[in-house]
A protein has these predicted regions:
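Hydrophobic alpha-helical transmembrane segments of multi-pass membrane proteins
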Residues: 27-28, 33, 40, 80, ...
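Final/C-terminal transmembrane alpha-helix of multipass membrane proteins
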Residues: 154, 162-178
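Short cytoplasmic-facing helical segments at TM-TM junctions of multi-pass membrane proteins
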Residues: 43-69, 151-154
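Hydrophobic membrane-spanning alpha-helices of multi-pass integral membrane proteins
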Residues: 59, 128-133, 164, 168-171
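Hydrophobic positions within alpha-helical transmembrane segments of bacterial inner-membrane proteins
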Residues: 30, 34-35, 43, 75, ...
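Start (N-cap) of specific transmembrane helices in multi-pass transporter permeases
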Residues: 63-83, 161
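Membrane-embedded translocation segments of transport machinery
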Residues: 4-48
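Membrane-interfacial helix-loop-helix connectors in multipass membrane proteins
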Residues: 1-20, 88-130, 134, 138-160, ...
Length: 185
């Protein structure tokens, strides 16, 4: 569409900024919320149904420290790494699309990308990842701990976990965008 206005030179700028600042981290967080968030809720919830959480308390272990904290730490490390992979895949895919539709060669794409973005653009998206990971882990764990004694309860809480985590991740992404605009980042 930019070709009609003679703005194909800005395709790389737009793709670079949009992918690195917003889309890659947001889509990665949504996928992690759906996959890992639901798994955390299901696992903790099934342990709650089988009274394994109560057994941990009886033997003197803190269920939060044993079950929740390790998952939270793993997500805080994994989501930024997955975001880096997502950034690279998004830019590689964008390069191929720009080449096929606009005739921008991959070498020209990379050259324009270097001119269009700097490290602050890259870090603007990467900074969000640990916060989103904490949200996903906390929401999933809280929903898992709320599970009652039935499979129906487990299913409801797994669904609620994914929906709540995705909603809060999108809200936090919007808050980051407003914060970045306020500090001119």
């Amino acid at each position: 569409q930019l070709q009609r206005f003679g703005a194909t030179a800005f395709v790389v700028d737009l793709i670079g900024v949009l992918s690195l600042r917003e889309l890659a981290v947001l889509l990665t967080a949504i996928m992690v919320a759906g996959r890992s968030g639901s798994a955390f809720t299901a696992e903790i919830g099934s342990m709650k149904m089988r009274e394994e959480i109560d057994a941990l308390k009886v033997i003197g272990l803190n269920p939060i420290g044993v079950l929740v904290f390790p998952r939270l730490v793993a997500l805080v490390f994994a989501l930024p790494l997955l975001t880096v992979v997502s950034d690279l895949v998004a830019l590689a895919g964008a390069s191929m699309v720009a080449w096929s539709y606009s005739g921008i060669s991959p070498a020209a794409f990379v050259g324009r990308l270097r001119d269009a973005i700097d490290m602050s653009t890259y870090f603007a998206g990467l900074i969000k990842a640990p916060f989103m990971a904490m949200i996903i882990g906390i929401v999933a764990s809280v929903e898992g701990m709320k599970v009652g004694g039935s499979a129906e309860s487990l299913g409801r809480h797994v669904t609620a976990s994914v929906v709540k985590a995705i909603f809060v991740v999108i809200v936090v992404d919007g808050l980051f965008a407003m914060f970045y605009a306020a500090i001119d980042f």
